[in-house]
Amino acid sequence: TINSTLQCHKIKIDNGPQKEYSCSGTPADCVKLGINEILNKKPDLCVSGINHGSNASINVIYSGTMSAAIEASVEGVPAIGFSLLDYSWKANFNPFKKIIKKITLKALKEGIPKRTALNVNFPNINENEIKGIKICNQANTYWIEKFDKRTNPQGREYFWLTGAVSYTHL
């Protein structure tokens, strides 16, 4: 975000000793600003998300959640991005609070390899359906691009991204 200003204001959402800020810009901008300007020292861990939708495979490069985590790792701060495979604005994140806390505390205690950002994706399931945690490599799938050209009521052209996921190797 080199063509606009970044705004940052101290806020208070949760009670506790943590410092809380609201910053404009992209998630990666906010991490850069926080680490290099706002905070007096590097944080022990950057936790990004939880966001709506999967950040698996190629989707990592489009994700604000993961861009924040990756930026933190580039800055030398261990990082985790959390995502839920549910695009609904009424998504229920509650079943995953305990797991997020468990992963976060384990990362703080045992550490994360230098310049590494963990990418944690939760399926859209109920709490009683959770069977555990599986560590895996990033998938090799990609999106087969297709754009539907449409016209809005004012007669202006726009495009709707459609397409499909390819499960073949790149």
Give the label of every model feature segment.
Residues S54-S63:
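Glycine/threonine-rich flexible loop motifs
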Residues T1-C30, G34-I35:
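A cross-family phosphate/adenosyl-ligand binding-site feature
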Residues D86-T104:
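Short, glycine-/small-residue-rich phosphate/pyrophosphate-handling segment
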Residues L84-K90, L108-P153:
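Active-site rim beta-loop-alpha module in soluble metabolic enzymes
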Residues T168-H169:
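Conserved small/polar residues in nucleotide/adenosyl-binding loops
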Residues I38-K42:
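Glycine-rich phosphate-binding loop signature in dinucleotide/nucleotide-binding domains
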